[in-house]
């Protein structure tokens, strides 16, 4: 990116931190730059014997409300926001008798420092800057015409720029980036402080330790809903791992619209089931998927926990149970297990997923059941005969449930419950083998894979993974499709006489 520098003829300066202001003002003055400034900044510059135009002279409107209103005026912001590349903008400025700025230098009220000093609520609120961020954001937006500086450490760059014809477009873009980061950080500090002030307890709470005993950890509560803000009725304090597993279970349970129970261990499902009969029936079915792994697991429910279900849970060693509500008497039943953590939480769909990596972070929209391919009405019949309504509902249950399984994921379901889960394998064949093995060995030696409904979170790259399921006797398969070997996979399903649907939507989970 290259462009001739934009000459700086007029600058707006409004700074709380006066560090480096004298050198900056002298550099601008020596270069013949007209300086417009506010309040104490203008006074400091004038005291140096440097010509400065007070902003109230520019606007024709006095500073008022104890300094709350200084620069929030069209004559200021028109001069900042005018895109001087556009003839109509220049014409409007001429008609309004407004001169454009080429440089805006601002730093903000010391909000963080005020909070750290122990100031009271009103004192902290008074240090929330309004006009400063408005000027910074306006100048950053209009970086093709304006350079914005928010850090006194960059004043030397300003001096160099005014002496050498101004900042280039590339440099102004970099300054705009820094400015938006600055205002975002400032707003984050203000919003976090408000959350802290208005919450019932500490926003950030230390945990006993992290994933392992040598790791420190905390939980930070944002807002008032969701798992982090759950009300705890019983049991020991929540641990880092408890929160991890409870979150995975909570997500799995709320992936279903029907009454659902999800049991999780090490962030993977031991069992998931839905039931219109009762939530207790859903719990029995979820537990039956893998009773051994469910020992010491975490349970999440998307409906009210009944006394009947509580009586069942009481008989099984469970670390955590979380639900939106509890039937009268259910909590008293669960309290018989003194170490069982009993949580009540208001469901809140996540707005964003964040993962820190070396040198930065990743963000993404959460993977919820909202894609077109998640609706069975939009599935493509790739092999076999179309399923009747009842069987299609079973296959949809498998598809909804497989999203809770770590990739590569294969899930087998029957009678609205998982019966075999193959999770976290580095190839899809092993995931299929694991799902079949667990279906056929974890419950009284029953051959549960036969006649089950299979879901794969991503396509089969070869027919071999599907063939494992076909040999086990699955009734139908749902998968995204999209492999370059789809025809090979389809042919295997057709040869076995097994129905297979393509969703066109993938649900990787890492």
From Swiss-Prot:
What GO cellular-component annotations does this UniProt entry give? cytosol
SUPFAM superfamilies named in the record: Cytidine deaminase-like, Methylglyoxal synthase-like
Pathway(s): Purine metabolism; IMP biosynthesis via de novo pathway; 5-formamido-1-(5-phospho-D-ribosyl)imidazole-4-carboxamide from 5-amino-1-(5-phospho-D-ribosyl)imidazole-4-carboxamide (10-formyl THF route): step 1/1; Purine metabolism; IMP biosynthesis via de novo pathway; IMP from 5-formamido-1-(5-phospho-D-ribosyl)imidazole-4-carboxamide: step 1/1
Q: Where are the transmembrane segments?
A: none
**A Pfam family reported for this protein in Swiss-Prot or TrEMBL:** AICARFT_IMPCHas
Q: Name the reaction it catalyses.
A: (6R)-10-formyltetrahydrofolate + 5-amino-1-(5-phospho-beta-D-ribosyl)imidazole-4-carboxamide = 5-formamido-1-(5-phospho-D-ribosyl)imidazole-4-carboxamide + (6S)-5,6,7,8-tetrahydrofolate; IMP + H2O = 5-formamido-1-(5-phospho-D-ribosyl)imidazole-4-carboxamide
Q: EC no.? A: 2.1.2.3, 3.5.4.10
Q: One GO biological process from the UniProt record?
A: 'de novo' IMP biosynthetic process
UniProt GO molecular function: IMP cyclohydrolase activity; phosphoribosylaminoimidazolecarboxamide formyltransferase activity
- The MGS-like domain covers which part of the protein? 2-150
UniProt keyword terms in alphabetical order: Hydrolase, Multifunctional enzyme, Purine biosynthesis, Transferase
Per its UniProt record, what PROSITE patterns does this chain match? MGS (PS51855)
Tell me which InterPro entries the record gives: AICAR_Tfase_dup_dom_sf, Cytidine_deaminase-like, MGS-like_dom, MGS-like_dom_sf, PurH-like
The family annotation for this protein states: Belongs to the PurH family.
Written domain comment of the UniProt record: The IMP cyclohydrolase activity resides in the N-terminal region.
- Under what name is this protein listed? Bifunctional purine biosynthesis protein PurH
- The organism encoding this protein is Corynebacterium aurimucosum (strain ATCC 700975 / DSM 44827 / CIP 107346 / CN-1) (Corynebacterium nigricans)
Gene name as annotated: purH
